Amino acid sequence: MDTSRKIIHIDMDAFYASVEQRDHPEFRGKPLIIGGDPNKRGVVATCSYEARKFGVHSAMPTRQAAKLCPNGIFIHGNMAHYVEVSNQIREIFSRYTDIIEPLSLDEAYLDVTENKKGMKSATMVARDIQQTIYHELGLTASAGVSFNKFIAKIASDFKKPAGMTVVAPEEAEAFLEQIPVTKFYGVGKVTAEKLHRLGIETGADLKKWSEWDLIRELHKHGYHLYRHVRGRSNNIVNPHRDRKSVGKETTFEFNVLDSRILEQSLMQFAKKVEARLIKLQKHGKTVVLKLRYSDFTTITKRLTLNEYTNDANQIYQAAALLLRESYTGQDSIRLIGLTVTNLKPVYFENLRLEGL
């Protein structure tokens, strides 16, 4: 395991909302929700920390957000402007290193093992970046510093907003043991529920399980979690990383015959894919359905749409059509997945912030 790398994960704090509050003094200190008209079928893209106190969060239906936060200020947002500010932030990153892996408009990994400023400490680099972003752009960022991407990302969320958490190699396992497994990158709702049923709530609980037992219960997630909780992750910061697809899949606890359950899963996946596409500022043209039967036979079907989309309704309708064409209901399903491929950036087009 390589512990010599110096990796920083920078995550802007409530990015879209913070830009709006910076630019519009009347929004400061108030619960601001980016996501459009709460009287229509929309989804929250992000919200200010004032709104989060009421339980509002990203990917939540705007109608639900309005019930939780009746005095919230709802706006559609200005995606073109957020792209512009994101580019300004990345320009600041480039003053320190060229090894930058953007994850979305508001977060990125930086490898500062050899940095342009000649700073020996990654902590100093991270603090300098935070201060530069604040002084030049009037925005706050949180930072995680460690020797690999997995730990750095978890650490950046540890002391939000405007915080920084540093995890040295000798501290990694103790740090990860105290973290709820729901905070582990890559652990979604379905995996979290499985872990909960197994009595695994923290990294310490996870560490008690053998590699074989985790793989048996969680398949590939178990393989990765066994390594992650021990600080083993050597994925490099990849400046040329370009996501080719966005998808979601789940393995059912019990094999499923009922097509209605499969359709419900596809609807949930479509919502999550929409939220991720919005965050990545991309839309796609091809919808892919994946089915794995109880005998482990796996099929994939795809449908190319007439136009690019990041709309959950359109994604779901395409996936449901593929399901009706592919599934007869005679054999039970072990796994179902939905992926949108053939992606391209939205950038200055009118990115849809309203979904389901």
UniProtKB/Swiss-Prot annotation:
Chain positions recorded as Mg(2+) binding sites: 11, 106
Spell out the catalytic residues. Answer: 107
Does Lipid biosynthesis count among this protein's keywords?
no
EC number(s)? 2.7.7.7
Q: Which cellular component terms (GO) are annotated to the entry?
A: cytosol
Q: Name one GO biological process term.
A: SOS response
Q: What is its main location?
A: cytoplasm
UniProt GO MF annotations = damaged DNA binding; DNA-directed DNA polymerase activity; magnesium ion binding
Q: Does the keyword Magnesium apply?
A: yes
Which catalysed reactions does the entry list for this protein? DNA(n) + a 2'-deoxyribonucleoside 5'-triphosphate = DNA(n+1) + diphosphate
Which Pfam family, just one, is annotated for this protein?
IMS_HHH
Q: Which UniProt keywords apply?
A: Cytoplasm, DNA damage, DNA repair, DNA replication, DNA-binding, DNA-directed DNA polymerase, Magnesium, Metal-binding, Mutator protein, Nucleotidyltransferase, Transferase
> Cellular location of this protein?
Cytoplasm
Q: How is the cofactor bound?
A: Binds 2 magnesium ions per subunit.
Site annotation Substrate discrimination: residues: 16
List residues of the UmuC domain. Answer: 7-188
HAMAP family reported in the protein's UniProt record: DNApol_IV
Query: What family name appears in the similarity comment?
Result: Belongs to the DNA polymerase type-Y family.
Q: Summarize the protein's role.
A: Poorly processive, error-prone DNA polymerase involved in untargeted mutagenesis. Copies undamaged DNA at stalled replication forks, which arise in vivo from mismatched or misaligned primer ends. These misaligned primers can be extended by PolIV. Exhibits no 3'-5' exonuclease (proofreading) activity. May be involved in translesional synthesis, in conjunction with the beta clamp from PolIII.
Which named protein is this? DNA polymerase IV
Taxonomic lineage is: Bacteria, Bacillati, Bacillota, Bacilli, Bacillales
